[in-house]
Amino acid sequence: MNAEHCKAYTLLQEQQIDDIHAHGYLLRHNKSGARVLLLENEDDNKVFNIAFRTPPADSTGVAHILEHSVLCGSREFPLKDPFVELVKGSLNTFLNAMTYPDKTMYPVASTNDADFQNLMHVYMDAVFYPNIYKHDEIFRQEGWSYHLESEDGPLTYNGVVYNEMKGAFSSADDVLERETFNTLFPDTPYGVESGGDPSCIPNLTYENFLNFHQTYYHPSNSYIYLYGNMDMEEKLAWMDEKYLSHFNAKEVKSEIPYQKPFAETLDIVHEYPVLDGDPLENNAYLSYNMVIGSGLDVKLNVAFSVLEYALLDAPGAPVKQALLDAHIGKDVYGSYEDGILQPFFSIVAKNADENEKEKFLSIIRGTLEDIVKNGMDQKAIEAGINYFEFRFREADFSSFPKGLMYGIDVFDCWLYDENKPFAYLQQLAIYDELKKLAKEGYFENLIQTYLLDNTHASIVTLIPKTGLAAENDAKTAEKLQKYKESLSKEEIEKIIADTKELAAYQEEEESEEALETIPLLKRSDIKRESIKLYNDEHEVDGTTVLHHNVFTNGIGYLSLLFDTKNVPNDLIPYMGVLKSVLGYVDTEHYTYGELFNEINAQTGGINCGLQVFRIPENDDDCRRMFGIRAKFLYDKLDFVMKMIEEILNTSRLDDEKRLHEIISSMKSGLQNRLSSAGNATAVMRAASYYSPMSNFQDRIAGIGFYQLLKDLDENFDEKKVELIKNLQTLMKYIFRKENLTVSYTADETGYAPLEEKIAAFKENLYTDEVEPGSIVYDFEQKNEAFQTSGQVQYVALCGNFEREGYDYTGALRILRVMLSYDYLWINIRVKGGAYGCGGAFGRGGNACISSYRDPNVGRTLEVYRGIGDYVRNFEADERQMTKYIIGTISELDVPMNPSAKGQTSESAWFNGITEADFQQERDQILDATLDDIHALADLVDAALKQNNICVVGSEAAIQKEKELFKNVENL
């Protein structure tokens, strides 16, 4: 790009950023004052992001509600939900919007040039010219409104953000995070909840909502980011001509102020909700939180990420271990909250006794003082630095575009100092510097300065209170009832009329004219070829070795996968324990802390996990694999094999104290995941009533597994002998050469030495004689509800269409998009107020529908049962069909990094899926007609009529409709 050609902009900075292989430009738009950052490189997965500094003054959630609302129609795209139309009919690789404590951003990504331009256009129009000024229904739908259907009915609140935040305020971990922000930053925007506190959201007026947009959504307060391989000059000219030149620069007071440091540490106690029957003793959270300098100090921030690893995250880390040894909490963890002006460091003990707060603080201080006096464990620091450097170099962000993540990183400085946008993109020199400084007392000085001598800190104690959620619900209901009683007949009729008017607005069909404002690609714009698989099969002394031959930039991704088909049924759940024990207990030559640090000092990590695959020729069973995965530079293959042998052959599985620590930590983590991802939990459990894959997953990672962990934790002394015996027995069943399949992602150079290493590795596997066992699937339609202390629900309905005689077809992928962004979106989210909803249809015949942070239960199930009729009566012209097809293809065509190419190929091989199968599915999608969609109606009806239900949610909502369930219990 030649910045001199861009006369509407002033070039402020230009530099080559070798760490991420990009050329950076910082510009200012002359007329509007917009800040613009460009990262030019060869990446075809292009990213656009427009963000605004949006400091909230209160906890009404105005920034969050506005983030939802601007995407509900604009000047050039006057639909009710252009965002959804884009999801349905765009080839995007990312499309979303996010509210942070101090900023709101609107990022999009696509590999298709025309599609990328369309996405930019819709988003620029949305933020600068939204329809919120024309339609107050948008505010009432997305934010909050009074809901009243009849004079005699209950007055309630409804709104997408309102219900989303009710879900967010249900989790103890979320409560702790909010109280930490509140205590550390009482005089800044960080001291309020940008997402919105459900008790405050109804205080937001429509006028204040509009004022917030007028104040902050101006180019002078904007940060525009472009990344990738594109004509940057053309994009700059388009933005200038179409939008930015229509605004004059103005002063926007949105700077984020520093919190004045405290003279002494703040100490507060706060309650969080638990259910009747949940323990009150040893169920508190103790948290010590310290503000760490400024986010503008990149080296300090990288160093504290390393310190979090070395002090708290790594197994055996000194602060964590000291607290566990003193029985302060059953789970101890740390967090370093960055991405804000003043990052903070937290040490948390969960399932603790609130009366041991002083002991908690004393142990932390004593341990840190000892480290300062005697020095850090240099291997732990080396491992921490290598861990973060490896991640930075690898730049593997899973399915998220690399440019998106870099675009989020730039805000860590750019938002607070507009002259430092590139700071967080250049970290390799910092890692080199930290390696030298580690030997000179640098980290010890950080501990003394920021963790020991720092009074800008808070101690937050969360204590459980039974019935708090019900108490809060009752207060809200009472407040609404009193308000209703204060209203005149005319005012009540007005609320009823408003409720009906909002429903009518939501049900109003979009006009063809409005729909056609959203640009749409043609079917012919989509490539016909399906994905390529990389599965070169080799035989090494009877063992299958899969070589996924792709360029990996010198990194090898190794998977040793062991078939567990002969594991006896009673040992199946203990595989879920074993995967979290191996690598985290002492071995012959290392303590578990030394082992973890040695591995992370030389590799990108070695991890164990369980995977389940279909057996296409046998729907009554599944393939269950225990995997050991490692990633490393090619020259570390010897080391990796040696460490895996050390773990498999010499792990101390009889260390009772360590096993109990691991079980307690696993239980704590799984409890959080089951509640926070309640939709996935409910789907897994409902499908476990009939599906071999889900039944197995539930027993090793779901509610069934949680029940085992709870029993082991609470009755450890009685169960420990059996636990140890089961783990030792499992080793002999699993880690045998006849069970092994190897999967390796590397180029030819990386692969060359592997076969010899595998042959040697197999000689050291178990050969003990064992009696082959087999899994027994305990299928039963349980139709359960699991009560949590939350205030919203996660509702799942599942069935299997293959058992009803129907076959999988690519058209089911189109149906998934139709349901997720049309039928379910309108009925569950827009009308029902849930935050999320979706459907999934698998090759094995599974059909699963679920909702997320949903205020309803029975109403939602009724909507699900209407899917068949919706499909039967679905009408679409060629344009609409094309839109759904494009949206479906965008889900298939996610750009893959080397690791993902290897994992996709491996998964396809185990599932028995070929390139021809993928091609057939793609052809079925691209050639789909309205008749193909209609043909799915009976399939859906047949599957969902099996009526496998599971709900995770609030006690009040579940008890109100308990007749829907065969069994109700606390989670």
Where are these regions (language model features)?
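Hydrophobic, small-residue-rich alpha-helical packing segments that form membrane-like cores
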Residues: 150-221, 225-243, 247-275, 280-282, ...
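Non-catalytic, conformational "gating/processing" segments within enzyme and secreted inhibitor domains
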Residues: 158, 210-242, 702, 723-758
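Active-site His/Glu-centered metal-binding helix of metallohydrolases
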Residues: 62, 66-70, 578
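His/Glu-based metal-binding/catalytic segments typifying zinc-dependent metallopeptidases
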Residues: 40-42, 49-51, 162, 166-170, ...
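Aromatic-residue-lined binding/catalytic grooves and analogous aromatic/hydrophobic interfacial grooves
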Residues: 446, 454, 710-724, 728-734
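Non-catalytic terminal extensions that flank enzyme cores
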Residues: 1-47
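M16 family metallopeptidases and their MPP-like homologs
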Residues: 45-55, 81-129, 136-147, 174-199, ...
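Extended, regular secondary-structure scaffolds
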Residues: 211, 223, 232-251, 374, ...
